[in-house]
Swiss-Prot record:
Provenance organism: Physarum polycephalum
Entry keyword set: Acetylation, Actin-binding, Cytoplasm, Cytoskeleton
Function, as annotated: Binds to actin and affects the structure of the cytoskeleton. At high concentrations, profilin prevents the polymerization of actin, whereas it enhances it at low concentrations. By binding to PIP2, it inhibits the formation of IP3 and DG.
Residues found modified as N-acetylserine: S2
Taxonomic superkingdom: Eukaryota
Family: Belongs to the profilin family.
UniProt gene name: PROP
Pfam families: Profilin
Subunit structure: Occurs in many kinds of cells as a complex with monomeric actin in a 1:1 ratio.
Identification of the protein by name: Profilin-P
Main localisation: cytoplasm
Cellular location(s): Cytoplasm, Cytoskeleton
CDD domains: PROF
GO cellular component: cell cortex; cytoskeleton
Length: 125
């Protein structure tokens, strides 16, 4: 399965996310749908996973929008802005980023991203 297929079917295709992107550990985009990163944001997200607790002080910025950090550990970083938010999860080779809008449930959105991360980790990614 291609990275784009994971984004299209396993993330956005679930209806629980409005947009998603998969980036490498270097911060470069591998696949995306309805979500983009501005210059340097991918690298900043990758760096944030080295000290994830910093998300509580600095937040997480995606597509120029700063989200307040609500979870930050070595696996997952979540951010929220109003009724919208993002869930990011790191695997051995990539970082999954899912965006949910005000009509979608944060818990369901995060679960979709976490489940795909589990699958990728189990399969060596």
């Amino acid at each position: 399965m291609s990275w784009q297929t994971y984004v299209d079917e396993q993330l956005v295709g679930t209806g629980q996310l409005d947009g998603a992107i998969i980036i490498g550990l270097d911060g470069n985009s591998w696949a995306s749908k309805n979500l983009t990163l501005k210059a340097g944001e991918g690298q900043a997200i990758a760096a944030l996973f080295k000290t994830p607790a910093n998300v509580f002080a600095s937040g997480i910025t995606i597509n120029g929008i700063k989200y307040m950090g609500i979870k930050g550990d070595s696996r997952s970083i979540y951010g929220k802005k109003g009724a919208t938010g993002v869930a990011t999860v790191i695997t051995g080779q990539c970082i999954l980023i899912g965006y949910y809008n005000e009509k979608q449930q944060p818990g369901n959105a995060a679960l979709v991203v976490e489940k795909l991360a589990d699958y990728l980790i189990e399969n060596g990614y």
